[in-house]
Amino acid sequence: MRDRLLAAEKVKAIDWRDDALYLLDQRVLPFEEVWHRYTTAEGVAEAIRTMVVRGAPAIGISAAYGAVLAARARIAQGADWYPALEEDMQLLADSRPTAVNLFWALNRMRDRLMRVKDGDDPLAALEAEAVAIHLSDREANLTMAQLGADLIRKHQGNLQTVLTHCNTGALATGGFGTALGVIRAAHLEGMIERVYADETRPWLQGSRLTAWELANEGIPVTLNADSAAAHLMRTKGITWVIVGADRITANGDVANKIGTYQLAVAAMHHGVRFMVVAPSSTIDMEMASGDDIVIEERDGRELLEVGGQRVGAEVEAFNPVFDVTPADLIDAIVTEKGIVERPDTARMAQLMSRKHLH
């Protein structure tokens, strides 16, 4: 399966070369493919904040490279560079508050810096660490893809009709995707009849990104309005809902793109299995439950403007980016460490105590 996934790879969103970070601008896909070059932490933070790059794993990887760019600039300034570097790290951390991969990656960069020995090059150490974060996410994607496909076969070996939400493919990660990685692997093994992709308002990641990725690989995909999801489950034989995650808490609650919670409720009602696919870096064992998650809200103009015109001067907007799906609505969480079925606090702790990949 690994070789087949590698052979099918067509899309990437992050490239590190010539001492600069290149990001594919996901705001203009699929109509344009525009790459931006970044040489400062400030630029990377702005790219994360404005969603040039999005998807929890991709945000974490980009932040790690942003830390390298910050270190290069600060070290060049001479003595006492570390406090200034920490300010840059905080700037990166503040760019998106919900995706735990962002903080995980920056903490890993801090830890690596603390382990640099006297006489060693801190910049080289940080660059190597950022590259390692990038490559490890790619490897995690491959492992999760196989584990998720195996889980589908375990429960239902026949052709599957899958519903997915937002974008969880190569554009959102350092490799092949989380939820879309599982769908890719299942398709290569002949188990996918059709994928239904929620359009995912208001940024339309499903229609602009997911449908584009799947169509490019010849995977049968149908785009649907978010509000059609429950009707699809009732009438179109949906067998799995497969989504990603931006943060998973110690009890198995999942923060993901707004609309995920209502999918889980509808899936439970219709007897449709619900799978979450995310690397272990998305799991925050310091956060007890989803009640503790800070939910990012974006500018109301994303909802209030249609065709550049405001819909009503007195109308207010509620525009949360994420919601929290309780663990008791989730059939399985798939990570590179293994699978947790019917997640709870004890099962999540057991998963995270594993020292080796599944």
From Swiss-Prot:
<dbReference type="GO" id="GO:0046523">
    <property type="term" value="F:S-methyl-5-thioribose-1-phosphate isomerase activity"/>
</dbReference>
<dbReference type="InterPro" id="IPR005251">
    <property type="entry name" value="IF-M1Pi"/>
</dbReference>
<dbReference type="InterPro" id="IPR042529">
    <property type="entry name" value="IF_2B-like_C"/>
</dbReference>
<dbReference type="InterPro" id="IPR027363">
    <property type="entry name" value="M1Pi_N"/>
</dbReference>
<feature type="binding site">
    <location>
        <position position="205"/>
    </location>
    <ligand>
        <name>substrate</name>
    </ligand>
</feature>
<feature type="active site" description="Proton donor">
    <location>
        <position position="246"/>
    </location>
</feature>
<feature type="binding site">
    <location>
        <position position="96"/>
    </location>
    <ligand>
        <name>substrate</name>
    </ligand>
</feature>
<dbReference type="InterPro" id="IPR000649">
    <property type="entry name" value="IF-2B-related"/>
</dbReference>
<dbReference type="Pfam" id="PF01008">
    <property type="entry name" value="IF-2B"/>
</dbReference>
<protein>
    <recommendedName>
        <fullName>Methylthioribose-1-phosphate isomerase</fullName>
        <ecNumber>5.3.1.23</ecNumber>
    </recommendedName>
</protein>
<feature type="binding site">
    <location>
        <begin position="256"/>
        <end position="257"/>
    </location>
    <ligand>
        <name>substrate</name>
    </ligand>
</feature>
<comment type="function">
    <text>Catalyzes the interconversion of methylthioribose-1-phosphate (MTR-1-P) into methylthioribulose-1-phosphate (MTRu-1-P).</text>
</comment>
<feature type="binding site">
    <location>
        <begin position="54"/>
        <end position="56"/>
    </location>
    <ligand>
        <name>substrate</name>
    </ligand>
</feature>
<feature type="site" description="Transition state stabilizer">
    <location>
        <position position="166"/>
    </location>
</feature>
<keyword id="KW-0413">Isomerase</keyword>
<keyword id="KW-0486">Methionine biosynthesis</keyword>
<dbReference type="GO" id="GO:0019509">
    <property type="term" value="P:L-methionine salvage from methylthioadenosine"/>
</dbReference>
<keyword id="KW-0028">Amino-acid biosynthesis</keyword>
<dbReference type="InterPro" id="IPR011559">
    <property type="entry name" value="Initiation_fac_2B_a/b/d"/>
</dbReference>
<dbReference type="InterPro" id="IPR037171">
    <property type="entry name" value="NagB/RpiA_transferase-like"/>
</dbReference>
<comment type="pathway">
    <text>Amino-acid biosynthesis; L-methionine biosynthesis via salvage pathway; L-methionine from S-methyl-5-thio-alpha-D-ribose 1-phosphate: step 1/6.</text>
</comment>
<comment type="similarity">
    <text>Belongs to the eIF-2B alpha/beta/delta subunits family. MtnA subfamily.</text>
</comment>
